[in-house]
Amino acid sequence: MFNMEPEVLERFTWYMREQSALTIMFHTKVAEQMGLSATDEKCLDLAMRADGPLTAGRIAELSGLSTGAVTGVIDRLERAGFVRRVRDPHDRRKVLVEVTAGDLAKFAHLFEKAQQSLVQVLSRFDPDEIEVIERYLQLQIETFRKAVINT
């Protein structure tokens, strides 16, 4: 195992905590403007990034929430017009959660500043550095998901 110097670990821990806090604040602000809670907005985001409709159980797995909590999230998202429940065409006993086009487009502007800041930061790196950053982020996400979310 790599012998991490305590100062390096401390710095990276601080960076990750700061990024996490800023991300939470950002999504809380976005959620408020959408009329949602931060949890509801992140579950909507999970559903939007999926390859297709998800079951409530799958949303629970991806979010780390209980299935009971996810049922409440889906109810609120459905009332707000962001998702709808549909029967699985292959198994009518299953209910899938499908993102609706609804008013999502009117909230796209909320993400523009975040996108612009990402472009601004990435433009300061050459392609080789971006490759290293991307590899780090992929490993961090994979490891964090296994160690924290899937426990």
Regions found by a protein language model. Give the residues of each.
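N-terminal leader segment of winged-helix/HTH proteins
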Residues: M1-M34
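C-terminal regulatory/oligomerization modules of transcriptional regulators
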Residues: M1-M4, D128-T151
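Alpha-helical linker/hinge and terminal dimerization helices associated
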Residues: Q19-F26, S63, K106, L110-V121, ...
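N-terminal helix-turn-helix DNA-binding core of bacterial DNA-binding proteins
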Residues: H27-L65
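Base-recognition residues in the alpha-helical recognition helix of bacterial helix-turn-helix
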Residues: D45, T71-G72
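Key DNA-contact positions within bacterial/archaeal DNA-binding proteins
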Residues: G68
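Residues within the DNA-recognition helix of helix-turn-helix
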Residues: V73-R76, Y136
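Charged, amphipathic alpha-helical coiled-coil/dimerization segments
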Residues: R76-E131
